[in-house]
């Protein structure tokens, strides 16, 4: 189905053994080493049912199947029998072992086949001596080295042979280019090199790459003899690719199908192939055509699925090494590679475009009517983990998501520049696809989290069986055909599930064979070893199970895959018989359906994570249920532990915040901040120095109206508006006014990052701007862009105000490289002028961080040449010494006198170390903040279970025969339990600030409130050996009022606890309550309650009191608690003061509450 030079059974290389000692590790060695190590350890590792290990195990199993099929194909060729692909695949067991020698030989045949395609020729060279050690047999003819007439006696011996110096075959200008390429660190970045044959002058694209024995050179005939035209053609191909990339980037997000449909249309427009498809690899390694663009008369393949063996693992590995694979003519006879007898094995052709397809694949292409093909790898971030769960990163973390495959019904050859442009397009497609997959994953995770929350709420409200018997249910957690819950011996099935007897049999099998596992997932119960899988039929093929306790299990079931497969093209008529011995798309499709007949869709890693999370939640819930009494007794200890964690977290965040403030105040970069009204509330010393406006004078001024130039007001307004909504802008240029006699009338330019300032409730309360002074840079750049004469004196000036500048012509060749660029990169101007900026200058000389960075740079450079400027583009690279440089790149079009665009100017801006340090501190602070928020969310979640235990225990006590004292203690316990529930439910406390905080209005007795408040401080009172003096009139305790009892007791308890904490040891604390009855205007009565909480000495520290009255800043958890309680009290029409008198201090709390009509109040 897919052309990769190795699809179906192999990639087509002949085998040999042994290695010559070399300086480079070949891709063949990497593949053989990794496969052999994996196969040796396969039987030593326990089965894993999710994540990267399972995917690796499947790939390892696939290697063995591929090798076995390859052996069958080879044997059929030797015996003269036809190769029945479908039958061979059906009879190839996945679990049988293959000798390691057979795997090694198979991989060697794939990668070291010894044959090339005839559309070009190949030469292998020893790197240090330029001595030829191998060449394809058609090289002499292509280079014009074979005599066209009868040779005479004077004829010299053949020029091209083993041991010939490569430089003698090409013109002097060509071999100079080759010599320079041979010493390059990244030789592939210089491809293609334009060279000419010494004999005929015929031009070639030389495509170089290193292998274990030297350097391999693919020579492809070029279509023009003018190298300038070749460069222009390459640039034109890149422009077409950039146009296609821009189209991809303009698509709406959230639609992967639209992205795939668009890329096949773009590739078909770019290359002209008859059919272009996107071929996706699923987690179980099988493939599917998910998008297609074709000629109208061709049969559609969209919707077809294919077995994993259609594209062997070895071929997939090759696609990660050489991302573009072209087959020009499957009918063409392959050309043998002649090589030095001293080489102990065939030359590795992994990186060669000329590598010949294996006979099996050529046969497959012939059967499907495809003569030529082009296959391009789609690579995304794989986030692969090692056995310890650690992300390995690097190149190995890139995953082959699929292929973009082109087919043509006649021979077709795409020149290297166009293939390279297609590779750029694939890199951009991979980046865009990766973002879409991440977005889809986030949406899925949010849905799962929302579902888990609903299921957890069910667990708290009802019995555990509610997650099956109610909606939503566990079936809504992951995609499945049925689900079940085996709880305390009772079976709760949903959808398509086994019967009671069958589920009991499955449980017995699990206990007997997987007793040491907490769960199991499989796409085939039969393959997993369940002996009675056949009795379940096609309805139940796959299963995921989570073990909650030894007798309680959660199950999810899926039916066989064939039910999920839909044919997306023309219907296959029943009378059209497929020939199983002829390999073609339909027979592959039927073979796939046979292979997956007893399999379900594989369980994805995200689905298993969701199941595992629910398993952990249920386990905790069941443990709480089994030990309810002990948990209830220990419940009082949960909240203090939570407070300790919160306090520790708050102290750490406070320390980071103080460090951040210190850095801001002493930073050598301009930093300023505004509140939600746009008025200055932060102004560091550097911005004061640059603007001439002191900190005192700046405070309170409007940023937009008083400090910004008129032409920038709209930009700053938009930046502020977005930042106050949480959308933080970056690298925005702002023009500030200056003050003072020395700076009067001068403008200051600063490039800022806008950071939303948030309070402890995560509410946005302002915006902080971290800037970089670019006044000198801006002035020089403006002059430089507008100048119309000799500008060299400006850009090559050693003045430090001159930024690093380089320029490109319309073919992306380096036209300018100023002194600042020489100093920054270490590369002199003479070495880069005339070189291609993409791949040569930035790529080979100044290395970028991977191919994705190169793709992005190519896009913005071509955009600038096309008239679209780019401002402050992140552009990190490595200088000549290998040191990493972080820079921002601004690109502007170059315009001739007559207004024609003739290239691009590029300006680099290097952020100062102070700015980078400030941003790093900000990132650490945000990371710490979100980490603590997660911990708090976890505490709030897990505390609900012991609260349920408390509520249950209290409800049991209420039904008992209690005396009056016991009833009062029970009422106090219930009030405290309700208070905790209220606090735990206050995750969205921003409503306290905006006034939308909901207060209840119920009738309650004041005595119940004071009893609950006092009970919450008694432990601290005893610890500090204090005496608590209560002066509360007896008649007030029995007084009934209207209001929010729980919130009132929360507020009073917080204030009283603060007094108790800071009262002198062995001293006393006083609690006075003085009521006053008032007649309201509407005829109703209200009581004014005045609480006085006092102790000797200073009492609560001044900083805690300041925290209480500050709306957004606090230094401790206690200050935060006091501030929140003050706000709640204010919403209840109350108020608080902290008063210090001679030798005593106290809180004075006043609140007025309505009194029921029938309540009489004695005069105070």
UniProtKB/Swiss-Prot annotation:
Q: How is it modified after translation?
A: Contains one covalently linked phytochromobilin chromophore.
GAF domain location is 255-437
Residues engaged in binding phytochromobilin: 360
Q: Which residues form the PAS domain?
A: 656-727, 790-861
Which GO BP terms sit in this record?
Answer: detection of visible light; red, far-red light phototransduction; regulation of DNA-templated transcription
Q: Where is the Histidine kinase domain?
A: 938-1157
GO CC entries: nucleus
Select a single GO molecular function from the record's annotations and give it. phosphorelay sensor kinase activity
| UniProt xrefs under SUPFAM superfamilies | ATPase domain of HSP90 chaperone/DNA topoisomerase II/histidine kinase, GAF domain-like, PYP-like sensor domain (PAS domain)
Top-level division of the source organism's lineage? Eukaryota
InterPro entries noted in UniProt: GAF (IPR003018), GAF-like_dom_sf (IPR029016), HATPase_C_sf (IPR036890), His_kinase_dom (IPR005467), HisK_dim/P_dom (IPR003661), PAS (IPR000014), PAS-like_dom_sf (IPR035965), PAS_2 (IPR013654)
Q: Which UniProt keywords apply?
A: Chromophore, Photoreceptor protein, Receptor, Repeat, Sensory transduction, Transcription, Transcription regulation
Task: Give me the stretches of Polar residues compositional bias.
Answer: 25-55
Question: Region Disordered: what ranges?
Answer: 1-55
Q: What does this protein do?
A: Regulatory photoreceptor which exists in two forms that are reversibly interconvertible by light: the Pr form that absorbs maximally in the red region of the spectrum and the Pfr form that absorbs maximally in the far-red region. Photoconversion of Pr to Pfr induces an array of morphogenic responses, whereas reconversion of Pfr to Pr cancels the induction of those responses. Pfr controls the expression of a number of nuclear genes including those encoding the small subunit of ribulose-bisphosphate carboxylase, chlorophyll A/B binding protein, protochlorophyllide reductase, rRNA, etc.
Hey, which family's this protein in?
A: Belongs to the phytochrome family.
Q: How does it assemble?
A: Homodimer.
NCBIfam families on file? sensory_box
Q: What is this protein called?
A: Phytochrome D
**Taxonomy of the source species:** Eukaryota, Viridiplantae, Streptophyta, Embryophyta, Tracheophyta
């Amino acid at each position: 189905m897919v052309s990769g030079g190795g699809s179906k059974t192999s990639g087509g290389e002949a085998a040999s053994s042994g290695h010559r000692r070399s300086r480079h590790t070949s891709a063949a060695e990497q593949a053989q080493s990794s496969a052999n190590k994996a196969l040796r350890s396969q039987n030593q590792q326990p089965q894993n049912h999710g994540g990267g290990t399972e995917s690796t195990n499947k790939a390892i199993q696939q290697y063995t199947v591929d090798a076995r099929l390859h052996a069958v194909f080879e044997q059929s060729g030797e015996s003269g029998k036809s190769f029945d692909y479908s039958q061979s695949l059906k009879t190839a067991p996945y679990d049988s072992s293959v000798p390691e020698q057979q795997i090694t030989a198979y991989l060697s045949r794939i990668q070291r086949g010894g044959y090339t395609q005839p559309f070009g020729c190949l030469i292998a060279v020893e790197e240090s001596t330029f001595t030829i050690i191998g060449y394809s047999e058609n090289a002499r003819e292509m280079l014009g080295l074979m005599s066209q007439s009868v040779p005479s006696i004077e004829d010299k011996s053949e020029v091209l042979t083993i041991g010939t110096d490569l430089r003698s075959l090409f013109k002097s200008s060509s071999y100079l280019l080759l010599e320079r390429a041979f010493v390059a660190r990244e030789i592939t970045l210089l491809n293609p090199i334009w060279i000419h044959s010494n004999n005929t002058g015929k031009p070639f694209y030389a495509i170089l790459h290193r292998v274990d024995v030297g350097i391999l050179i693919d020579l492809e005939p070029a279509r023009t003899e003018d190298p300038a035209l070749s460069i222009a053609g390459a640039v034109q191909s890149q422009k077409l690719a950039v146009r296609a990339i821009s189209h991809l980037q303009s698509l709406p997000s959230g639609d992967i199908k639209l992205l795939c449909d668009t890329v096949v249309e773009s590739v078909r427009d770019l290359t002209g192939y008859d059919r272009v498809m996107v071929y996706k690899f699923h987690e179980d390694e099988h493939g599917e055509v998910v998008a297609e663009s074709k000629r109208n008369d061709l049969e559609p393949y969209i919707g077809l699925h294919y077995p994993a063996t259609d594209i062997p693992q070895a071929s997939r590995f090759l696609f990660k090494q050489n991302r573009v694979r072209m087959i020009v003519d499957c009918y063409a006879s392959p050309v043998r590679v002649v090589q030095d007898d001293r080489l102990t094995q065939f030359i590795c052709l992994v990186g060669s475009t000329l590598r010949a397809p294996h006979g099996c694949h050529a046969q497959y292409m012939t059967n499907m009517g495809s003569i030529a093909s082009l296959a391009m790898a789609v690579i995304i971030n794989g986030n692969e983990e090692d056995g310890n769960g650690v992300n390995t990163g690097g190149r190995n973390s890139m995953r082959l998501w699929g292929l973009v495959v082109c087919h043509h019904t006649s021979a077709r050859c795409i020149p290297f520049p166009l293939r390279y442009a297609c590779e750029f397009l694939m890199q951009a497609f991979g980046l865009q696809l990766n973002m879409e997959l991440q977005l889809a994953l986030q949406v899925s995770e949010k849905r799962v989290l929302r579902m888990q929350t609903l299921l957890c709420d069910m667990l708290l409200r009802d019995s555990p069986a509610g997650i099956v018997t109610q909606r939503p249910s566990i079936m809504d957690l992951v995609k499945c055909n049925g689900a079940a819950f085996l709880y305390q011996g009772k079976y709760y099935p949903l959808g398509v599930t086994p019967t009671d007897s069958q589920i009991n049999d499955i449980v017995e099998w699990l206990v007997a064979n997987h007793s040491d596992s907490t769960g199991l997932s499989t796409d085939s119960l039969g393959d997993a070893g369940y002996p009675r899988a056949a009795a379940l039929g096609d309805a139940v093929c796959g299963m995921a199970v989570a073990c909650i306790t030894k007798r309680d299990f959660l199950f999810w079931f899926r039916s066989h895959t064939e039910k999920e497969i839909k044919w997306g093209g023309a219907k296959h008529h029943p009378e059209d018989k497929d020939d199983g011995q002829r390999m073609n798309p339909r027979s592959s499709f039927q073979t796939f359906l046979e292979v997956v007949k007893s399999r379900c869709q594989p369980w994805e890693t995200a689905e298993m994570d969701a199941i595992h999370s629910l398993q952990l939640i249920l386990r905790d819930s069941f443990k709480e249920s089994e030990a309810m009494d002990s948990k209830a007794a220990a419940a009082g200890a949960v909240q203090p532990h939570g407070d300790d964690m919160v306090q520790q977290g708050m102290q750490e965040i406070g320390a980071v915040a103080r460090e951040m403030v210190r850095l801001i105040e002493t930073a050598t970069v301009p930093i300023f901040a505004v509140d939600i009204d746009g008025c200055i509330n932060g102004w560091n010393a550097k911005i004061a120095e640059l603007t001439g406006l002191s900190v005192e004078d700046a405070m309170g001024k409007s940023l937009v109206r008083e400090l910004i130039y008129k032409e920038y007001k709209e930009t700053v307004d938009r930046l502020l508006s977005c930042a106050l909504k949480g959308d933080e802008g970056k690298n925005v240029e702002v023009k500030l006014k200056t003050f003072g006699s020395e700076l009067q009338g001068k403008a200051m330019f600063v490039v800022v990052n806008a950071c939303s300032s948030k309070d402890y409730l995560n509410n946005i309360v302002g915006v902080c701007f971290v800037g970089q002074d670019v006044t000198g840079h801006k002035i020089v750049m403006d002059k430089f862009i507008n100048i119309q004469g000799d500008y060299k004196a400006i850009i090559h000036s050693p003045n430090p105000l001159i930024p690093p500048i380089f320029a490109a012509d319309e073919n992306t060749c380096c036209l300018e490289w100023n002194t600042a660029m020489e100093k920054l990169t270490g590369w002199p101007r003479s070495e880069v002028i005339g070189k291609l900026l993409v791949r040569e200058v930035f790529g080979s000389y100044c290395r970028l961080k991977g191919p994705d960075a190169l793709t992005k740079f190519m896009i913005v450079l071509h955009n600038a040449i096309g008239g679209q400027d780019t401002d402050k583009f992140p552009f990190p690279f490595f200088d000549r010494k290998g040191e990493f440089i972080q820079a921002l790149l601004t690109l502007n079009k170059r315009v001739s006198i007559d207004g024609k665009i003739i290239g691009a100017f590029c300006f680099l801006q290097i952020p100062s170390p102070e700015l980078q340090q400030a941003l790093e501190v900000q990132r650490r602070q945000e990371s710490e903040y979100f980490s603590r928020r997660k911990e708090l969310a976890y505490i709030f979640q897990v505390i609900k279970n012991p609260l349920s235990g408390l509520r249950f225990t209290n409800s049991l006590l209420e039904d008992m025969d209690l005396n009056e004292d016991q009833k009062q203690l029970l009422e106090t316990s219930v009030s405290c339990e309700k208070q905790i529930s209220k606090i735990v439910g206050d995750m969205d406390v921003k409503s306290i600030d905006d006034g939308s905080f909901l207060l209840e209005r119920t009738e309650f007795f004041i005595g119940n409130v004071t009893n609950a408040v006092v009970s919450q401080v008694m432990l601290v009172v005893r610890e500090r050996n204090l005496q608590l003096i209560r002066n509360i009139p007896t008649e007030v305790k029995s007084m009934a009022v209207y209001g929010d009892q729980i919130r009132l007791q929360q507020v009073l308890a917080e204030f009283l606890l603060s007094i108790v904490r800071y009262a002198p040891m062995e001293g006393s604390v006083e609690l006075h309550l003085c009521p006053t009855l008032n007649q309201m205007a509407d005829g109703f009565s209200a009581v004014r309650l005045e609480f006085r909480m006092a102790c000797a000495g200073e009492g609560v520290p001044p900083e805690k009191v300041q925290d209480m009255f500050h709306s957004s800043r606090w230094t401790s958890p206690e200050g935060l608690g006091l501030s929140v309680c003050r706000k709640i009290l204010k919403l209840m029409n109350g108020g608080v003061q902290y008063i210090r008198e001679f030798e005593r201090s106290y809180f004075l709390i006043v609140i007025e509450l309505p009194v029921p009509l029938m309540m009489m109040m004695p005069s105070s």
